[in-house]
């Protein structure tokens, strides 16, 4: 069975192992989640597991969602996300998913929405080199040339230019699970995960071996 769970980001801290080596970790509140729907190739064209996380009061749920949760026999949830698994049939509607599906040492992928930085210049957005900062220079933090003249007569797609930075879907792969706290539904992951505090993060076992 493929392992996956929804979590919210609490923040970062650091811990020491038995050898005194410091490790930066991200603390996540993972689950408990509920399976609200199991999609199959025959009925939906693809196999996936729909998971709900975070109980909310009934007044925050619209009528179609109320019916959906009632049909699954679960409480109203704040977040609903799908995990596409070939073996989705291993899950059952109403099943509870807890953080103990993972163990210390597992490798997981974390998907979330990165922090929005607003409209930024090309140097901050893409890491371009700046020009001379001397008094006589007329080129400080410009992006430089964005193309030739008549030929090709256009700016190529993907050219590094100023624009909206951040607030996009990001997946960080092969993160190591450092510690599991089953009693408090906490999972400690080595390194950073996308998004600000309280952001919703999708955690699933890694798709790459990392070798």
Swiss-Prot record:
GO terms for biological process: translation. GO terms for molecular function: rRNA binding; structural constituent of ribosome. Keywords: Ribonucleoprotein, Ribosomal protein, RNA-binding, rRNA-binding. GO terms for cellular component: cytosolic large ribosomal subunit. Part of the 50S ribosomal subunit. Forms a cluster with proteins L14 and L19. Belongs to the universal ribosomal protein uL3 family. One of the primary rRNA binding proteins, it binds directly near the 3'-end of the 23S rRNA, where it nucleates assembly of the 50S subunit. This is Large ribosomal subunit protein uL3. It comes from Lachnoclostridium phytofermentans (strain ATCC 700394 / DSM 18823 / ISDg).
